[in-house]
Amino acid sequence: MKYLLVILCLCCFFSCSRTQELSLAELEAQGTEGLSEILAKTVSKPWRGEEFAPGRLGGTWRSVVKDEPKSFNLLIAEQDSATAAIVRSMHDSLLEYDMVRREWKPRAAEAQIVVDEKANTLTVFYALRDDLYWSYYNSDRKVKVTSDDVIFWYNEIEGDPACLSSGFHSQFLTMPDGSEAHVDIRKIDERRFAFHFPRIIADPLLHTNMDFGPRHIYEPAKKQGGADGVRNLFRVDIDPKTIPSMGEWFLVEYTQGQRMVFKRNPNYWRKDANGASLPYLEEEIVRIIPDENTQLLLFRNGESDSYRLRPEDIDGLVNRGDGSYTVFNSEGSLSAAFWTFNQNPQNKDKPQYEWFTQKEFRQAMSCLLNRSRINTQVYRGLAEPKYSLFPEPNPYYNPALKLQYLYDLKRAETLLSSIGIKKDSAGVMRDNKNRPVEFDLSIRSESTINQDTASIIRDELAKLGIKVNIRVMDFQKQVEQLFSTFDWDSIIMGLSGSNIFPSQGSNVWPSTGNLHMWNPNQETPATDWEARIDYLYNEGKFTIDPVKAQGIWDEFQSILLEECPLIHLMRTRGFWAINNRWDFTNVYFDNMNGAEISYIWLK
């Protein structure tokens, strides 16, 4: 499975001694920032597999987003989270994974796995629901969803390297002899199709689960204009009512810089226990508000229905609420934003490339990351450092495997010295060519959390004579740097997904991946450790025995925690507020599923 790009005060001590980094449990025990009191004033309601109660139709959900969509195109959505948030409401995946029960469940299709142990092959048979349609808003026109839609998307969109889909490389498996073989798809009939794996794989449903677009629109565009024709479909300047939907919603209005309006799709397949079509909501109005303070003001004024709290909002919304809303809380997030450094050889003439490609430099940066200070000053004590690669729900999570490069200025200085980076008489860090150590740190303009975190990083590195220039930019500019120009130094970024399965991140961890952030799309591994990661990732994918698999994934995690290509930041405890005009019977909020409002209805 591939990832998508997404973007997530006490006195400070300035001694050079190591500062202990407290866990969330320790912070709670010490009463830091009144965590116990805050939790007592909020609602804990994680989803644990409960059935959803029948509701009633009606109501308009009012929400806000930070970012403009780049397109309404499913292919573009792979690299743009703002686009993905919109497009995915008009599509559906074949399956969904229930993290509570740890099992796959049907969505658009049912799946059956057939293993041929003698031939060492595997086939996944899918059968689409019979009530799936590409529907058009305010029209009787409906086009049946068939296996041809899935097969076309797999072969002609994801499977065409010219389309630059992040799913391309995952269609190939490395065979025991080192050769590559393709995972083929074949049509059985109008509803049924099958993926044939040339060797047995550990997570075939994860590997084959996918979204797909309408063949009757994308195929003519590709025949006429190739990959560019595909990517130019559904631009933001079209009439959105012309976009078909097989999902919960139609997009019926888009006013650039202002808002989007969605209407429920009455032909959507999902029904409640009484057979009523979902969602219950008739409409959703989404305002585009880049400024987080304005988002907060809209919520407090009753002009939006929900709001995800920042640390600085806790006191005002939790301790001084007006009774018009309820705040839910969740445990620390499974994933975290990270700090990473550009190792792309396109920049090999820059001094930063020489520094960033040495693991001792990256390890030193991890030792200069004062996570306790970030937790206290940025998160008000409501977070904890992410030291492990895999989260606890991952079956191969190993609590003994933790990051070893914690906040320690002396150790950082020793690591830098080992690669010839030392302070001069004026306290400025210089490399072995007498160049001052200075680099940029790119962050999103809309995120106050990233801005505050970057300021702490700059301050901590300055203690050792390293200059950091904070570059604030919008998300689209960050995406351009990461995927097109590669002209960045370091960046704070986040990815969707949380490694619930060890083989998630097929476009992140292998060196060929387009989200192998620090040096993407490698033809051959640039380093020995990346070659080893490629090998382990591949072996782990095909290892069924849990004991053998544990050894593989342990080494995989250990290498990445040692090499520090991604330095993870904080796991944040979540707080989410919702207007009390809604019925909360089917509302849940937790760190695995986020905010569950699919079955919400108006009081």
Regions found by a protein language model. Give the residues of each.
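Bacterial N-terminal signal peptides
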Residues: 5-13
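Extracytoplasmic/periplasmic ligand-capture domains
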Residues: 16-51, 99-100, 117, 121, ...
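N-terminal lobe/hinge region of extracytoplasmic solute-binding protein
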Residues: 43-48, 59-119, 244-246
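A structural "hinge/loop" feature
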Residues: 48-52, 65-87, 108-109, 136-143, ...
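Conserved positions in beta-strands of structured domains
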Residues: 113, 186, 250-252
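Surface-exposed binding/hinge segments that line
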Residues: 163-227
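Glycine-rich and polybasic anion-binding loops at the starts of cofactor/ligand-binding domains
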Residues: 569
